[in-house]
Amino acid sequence: MKLFYAPGACSLSPHIALLESGLEATLVKVDTKAHKTEGGGDYYAVNPKGYVPLLELDDGDRLTEGPAIVQYIADRNPKSKLAPAAGTMERYHLQEWLNFITAELHKQFSPLFQAATPAEYKETLKEKIGKRFDWVAEQLKGKDYLMGDTFTVADAYLFTMLIWTKHVGIDLARWPVLAAYKVRIAARPKVREAMIAEGLIKQNDPVAA
């Protein structure tokens, strides 16, 4: 398999999932502004949507949306417990989380990274994200992970959103539960491995809040 990614982008989520699952995959770095792969290829030829992540399977089939990709990864190694079994209520709750993170968090964050987004609109988006964080923090009270005691692909996705906060001026100190959760996820060996591989942290960096 090949995972097409950009450092620190939402593709960090499936990158973490791959490492946690123990599955082997080749990483292909993408410059999402130039739409070029690290080898100089036209990324649009790989993914006409132009964004990451993209998972290319060994048979040439391709998946291009994060929630689909991470569930595919989880299902390839059920022993990893990265996703509950298909058809169970627990799986539907996982999908509920993935959909929430996609629609209510990820899509609110994206314009915050765009220089052309008006400052007033950015503040509106931050307020919306804050309200969503209020709710997520309530759900996490008394739990280590979104689904309880087990780390799942939903946690990898939420963690990715949380590390974005420092880049857009959102202070997690307002949500101690989320701040502690972020540190807890960041301390996982495979999460650190993914972040080191993407150049987000260095080998000897301490777990940062």
Which residues are covered by each model-predicted region?
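GST-like domain detector, emphasizing the conserved glutathione-binding G-site
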Residues: M1-E127, A137
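Helix N-cap/coil-helix junction residues
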Residues: L23, I170-L172, L200
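Short, solvent-exposed turn/loop segments enriched in Gly/Ser/Thr/Pro and often Arg
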Residues: D31, V153, E198-G199
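Generic structural signal for helix capping and beta-alpha/helix-loop junctions
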Residues: H35-T37, K182, K202-Q203
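Short secondary-structure transition/capping segments
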Residues: E38-D42, A186, D205-V207
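GST-like fold's C-terminal all-alpha helical module
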Residues: M89, W97-K190, A194, A209
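Terminal-tail/helix-coil boundary detector
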Residues: I196-A209
